[in-house]
UniProtKB/Swiss-Prot annotation:
CDD domains: PBP1_PrnA-like. GO terms for cellular component: plasma membrane. The keyword Cytoplasm does not apply. InterPro entries: BMP_lipoprotein, Peripla_BP_I, PnrA-like. Pfam families: Bmp. It comes from the Archaea. Belongs to the BMP lipoprotein family. Residues 1-20 form the signal peptide. It is a lipid-anchor. It comes from Pyrococcus horikoshii (strain ATCC 700860 / DSM 12428 / JCM 9974 / NBRC 100139 / OT-3). The modification N-acetylcysteine is found at residue 21. Keywords: Acetylation, Cell membrane, Lipoprotein, Membrane, Signal. A lipid is attached at residue 21 (S-archaeol cysteine). This is Uncharacterized lipoprotein PH1714.
């Protein structure tokens, strides 16, 4: 299947995101270059099947295999304790031109291994070791930017559902999730400031990215506390959140909606998931591989946000493409991709009103133009301080540059 994925606000994005990573030449020439390149994709402990982060990485690698002709192998450690031995084993083998490490949990293992094998190239996706090495590329995302937009959208939908409370089912208490938390709360308070409508956020860490039952139970608790919209930030775990929202509605316990993240997840329950945030893990993986194929590899840290088309939210073209992918994989059984799109379109029109889109677009422009730049907390204490200030309505506490009056 073609990975023709679309982002709202930013438009259709299939080209590379990382400046300088894409070299010239025809696809045939690139495929010839890539035939001798061997890459290992190392998922985090959640592995494939999360319909989100790891599956997006898989899509990027499969695109590289098809377009660049590289050989790809996939591996998932059984536990965090297995990560260093696995990484050491692969680096020592000298069998792979590139080891792509998917997710924050690989940060410490990479720091332990990278200097021992200076000739082995590593790409760390969604984290950084904090060290600049010639054999290491770290690709980060400015999660605050997508989460801020989703916070505005969630707040607007909550009011359409007759409430003022939004929630989030998050995975582990780690830096990428800190940024999501800051952005989501910022978006809610930005909505509050623009409309005068109070918004309450219920944020819950589950401690796992791979347990749907935990996601279900956590979501039910948040719904019982009054949350009208839940944002899934826990990989496979938040698939359980989707099930909880579906049951909540269909059992007549109240009205609630869910929002996905990373991949377009609307197809899973389009009546109850009108929108998903986008985090282009797929393109980050693809571009890391292409740097090796093209011979343009340069160690360092790359950060992607709205301006670089690295984050956003999925438009209806993206919804359809992922619904088609789900259909081909046998996961979408009860409707066609076109039916998914039609339901999502109707739900967006019903629950995301024009005034909300105006606020979203205004905020997105400020972010893309650099008028607003979010802080990235360097410690858990700083993260907590920012959250505490945001809860008081001090939006500027989250900003490195710019202000909200």
């Amino acid at each position: 299947m073609k990975a023709k994925l679309a982002l709202s606000i930013i438009g259709l994005v299939l080209a590379s995101l990382v400046a300088g990573c894409i070299g010239g030449g025809t696809q045939t020439q690139t495929q010839t270059q890539g035939k001798s390149i061997k890459v290992a994709i190392l998922f985090d402990v959640g592995g494939r099947g999360d319909l989100s982060f790891n599956d997006m990485a898989y899509l990027g690698a499969e695109r590289a295999k098809k377009e660049l002709g590289v050989k790809i192998e996939y591996m998932t450690p059984k536990s965090k304790e297995d990560m260093v031995p696995l990484l050491e084993q692969l680096a020592k083998s000298k069998e792979y031109d590139l080891l792509v490490l998917v997710g924050f949990l690989w940060t410490t293992p990479l720091n332990e291994v990278a200097d021992k094998y200076p000739d082995q190239k590593f790409a760390l996706i969604d984290s950084t070791t904090g060290k600049v090495r010639p054999n290491e590329v770290d690709i980060l995302f400015r999660e605050q930017e997508v989460a801020a937009l989703m916070g505005v959208i969630a707040s607007g939908m909550a009011y359409e559902l007759g409430g003022d409370t939004i929630g989030a089912v998050a995975g582990m208490d780690i830096p990428p999730l800190w940024k999501f938390h800051i952005g989501y709360l910022f978006g809610a308070k930005y909505f509050e400031k623009k409309t005068g409508k109070h918004v309450k956020l219920l944020w819950q860490y589950t401690g796992t990215f791979g347990d749907t039952q935990v996601g279900y139970n956590t979501a039910m608790q948040l719904l019982q506390q009054g949350a009208k919209v839940l944002y899934g930030l826990a990989g496979l775990t938040h698939v359980g959140m989707f099930d909880a929202v579906k049951d909540w509605n269909e059992q007549g316990r109240g009205k609630a909606l869910a929002m996905g993240q990373d991949a377009s997840q609307e197809w899973y329950a389009p009546k109850y998931i009108p929108i998903s945030g986008a985090k282009r893990v797929d393109v980050a993986v693809y571009d890391a591989i292409k740097m090796v194929v093209d011979g343009t590899w340069k160690g360092g840290i790359i950060t992607l946000g709205l301006k670089e088309n690295g984050v956003g939210y999925w438009d209806l073209d993206g919804v359809k493409q992922f619904a088609e992918f789900a259909k081909e994989a046998g996961k979408l059984k009860d409707m066609t991709p076109d039916e998914v799109v039609e339901i999502v379109k109707q739900q967006r029109e019903k629950y995301i009103k024009p005034y909300v889109w105006e606020i979203v677009n205004e905020l997105a422009e400020k972010i893309k133009n650099g008028e607003i730049v979010f802080k990235t907390p360097k410690s858990h204490d700083e993260y907590e301080q920012i959250i505490n200030e945001l809860e008081k309505g001090n939006l500027n506490a989250a900003l490195k540059k710019g202000s909200v009056e």
